[in-house]
């Protein structure tokens, strides 16, 4: 059986109070940026969207979205790496008998520019999902300066995942 899941996430971004080197974490990769993400965890919108896509595809009772498993009201998730969230969810879907066929992620932002980091992002996501890099696509787009992304008020990501049930 094949299953498909879709995920979306958004976080506010803001100029840091102190000047200096800042980064935004995207797909588990630190990308230099003049903005910081306002979030409870590390704010990796791409991995958060991926977690929701994985959970949506697997339809595991009691764990159908990121907020159920890792609520932002729980202090134990404050500053937590989103890679941990993906690893935990991969364990859940593997226990449920699923493997990942492929994942496609789109990051929507005016900043940072991610072209030079895409290959590293693909590899990081592939490693987290226990698949080959060729099974992962990461791309970015802007909104042509429209909306909150265009005004550099936030960053968003979409993810779609295909799973195959290999055992009951």
From Swiss-Prot:
Quote the cofactor binding remark.
Answer: Binds 1 divalent metal cation per subunit.
| Residue ranges of the TM segments | none
User: Which GO terms of the molecular function aspect are on file?
Assistant: 2-C-methyl-D-erythritol 2,4-cyclodiphosphate synthase activity; metal ion binding
Amino-acid positions noted as binding 4-CDP-2-C-methyl-D-erythritol 2-phosphate in the UniProt annotation, renumbered to this chain: 9-11, 40-41, 65-67, 70-74, 141-144, 148, 151
Show the SUPFAM superfamilies listed in the entry. IpsF-like
The GO annotation for biological process reads: isopentenyl diphosphate biosynthetic process, methylerythritol 4-phosphate pathway; terpenoid biosynthetic process
| UniProt site (Transition state stabilizer) | 40, 142
Give the signal peptide as a residue range, or say none if absent.
none
InterPro entries, per this entry?
MECDP_synthase, MECDP_synthase_CS, MECDP_synthase_sf
- Look up keyword Metal-binding and say if it applies: yes
The record, for Gene3D superfamilies, names: 2-C-methyl-D-erythritol 2,4-cyclodiphosphate synthase
Broad class of enzyme this protein falls into: lyase
What is the superkingdom listed in this entry's lineage?
Bacteria
**EC number of the protein:** 4.6.1.12
Q: Does the keyword Lyase apply?
A: yes
- Reaction(s) catalysed (UniProt annotation): 4-CDP-2-C-methyl-D-erythritol 2-phosphate = 2-C-methyl-D-erythritol 2,4-cyclic diphosphate + CMP
NCBIfam families xref list: ispF
Q: Which PANTHER family match?
A: 2-C-METHYL-D-ERYTHRITOL 2,4-CYCLODIPHOSPHATE SYNTHASE, CHLOROPLASTIC
Main function = Involved in the biosynthesis of isopentenyl diphosphate (IPP) and dimethylallyl diphosphate (DMAPP), two major building blocks of isoprenoid compounds. Catalyzes the conversion of 4-diphosphocytidyl-2-C-methyl-D-erythritol 2-phosphate (CDP-ME2P) to 2-C-methyl-D-erythritol 2,4-cyclodiphosphate (ME-CPP) with a corresponding release of cytidine 5-monophosphate (CMP).
Q: Which family does it belong to?
A: Belongs to the IspF family.
Under which name does UniProt file this protein? Answer: 2-C-methyl-D-erythritol 2,4-cyclodiphosphate synthase
- The organism encoding this protein is Neorickettsia sennetsu (strain ATCC VR-367 / Miyayama)
| Classification lineage | Bacteria, Pseudomonadati, Pseudomonadota, Alphaproteobacteria, Rickettsiales
What gene name is listed for this protein? ispF
């Amino acid at each position: 059986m094949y299953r498909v899941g879709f995920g979306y996430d958004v976080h506010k971004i803001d100029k840091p109070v102190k000047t200096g080197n800042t980064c935004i974490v995207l797909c588990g990769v630190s990308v230099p940026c003049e903005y910081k993400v306002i979030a409870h965890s590390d704010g990796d919108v791409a991995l958060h969207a991926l977690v929701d896509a994985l959970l949506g595809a697997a339809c595991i009772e009691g764990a159908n979205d990121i907020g159920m498993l890792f609520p932002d009201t729980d202090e134990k998730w404050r500053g937590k790496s989103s890679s941990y969230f993906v690893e935990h969810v991969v364990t859940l879907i593997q226990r449920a008998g699923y493997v990942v066929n492929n994942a496609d992620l789109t990051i929507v932002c005016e900043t940072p520019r991610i072209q030079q980091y895409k290959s590293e992002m693909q590899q990081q996501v592939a490693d987290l999902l226990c698949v080959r890099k060729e099974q992962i696509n990461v791309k970015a787009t802007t909104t042509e300066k429209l909306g909150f992304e265009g005004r550099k008020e936030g960053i968003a990501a979409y993810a779609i995942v295909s799973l195959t049930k290999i055992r009951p």
